[in-house]
């Protein structure tokens, strides 16, 4: 399994007062940015159906999200983020099992692995940082991203990054606490931008993922 940080996240539907609530909680606005994300998969959706998500972000490079911790229920996800191109390529060859792997960057192996663009869209993001009161100074802050995609969809995400599986429950507890402070209903589940994009523009692919998820074959919705 590829190594990387474990991302623990929960998506929610932001309201008109979300930024005001963040300010009241003492969150600080880190930056506002605009970027393009492009996602790749095979025509059979081999990656997404196995809960792997390959993305190229403009200005940031490649990332492969792989399934993380299992067995923790609720409206949240845990993924291992792999950003080293060598590690991504190794994982892609392991997943897709196509021929002999040679040293190369991700872009160079797209063709041989039959990976093609399945989605591309622009996001405007405001990124906030928040440390819960009483937290130790060395504890990582939570990140709250508020995204607006160019196809008319907005979604928020509360995120924590941890190094070990043992840290996931504590991170999840913080995420649930902050979500509650922001007025997010306990069981609210907001879909990722990619899933909404596929639903609108590639409905057949979206339906395949939906059917696989309902049958327990996949656990989609990681794409941020």
UniProtKB/Swiss-Prot annotation:
Optimum pH is 7.5-9.5. GO terms for cellular component: cytosol. Its EC number is 3.6.1.28. Residues 5-201 form the CYTH domain. GO terms for molecular function: magnesium ion binding; thiamine triphosphate phosphatase activity. This is Thiamine-triphosphatase. Monomer. One of its GO terms (biological process) is thiamine diphosphate biosynthetic process. PROSITE patterns: CYTH (PS51707). It catalyses: thiamine triphosphate + H2O = thiamine diphosphate + phosphate + H(+). It comes from Mus musculus. It is an enzyme of class 3 (hydrolase). Hydrolase highly specific for thiamine triphosphate (ThTP). It comes from the Eukaryota. Belongs to the ThTPase family. The modification N-acetylalanine is found at residue 2. The keyword Oxidoreductase does not apply. Its cofactor is Mg(2+).
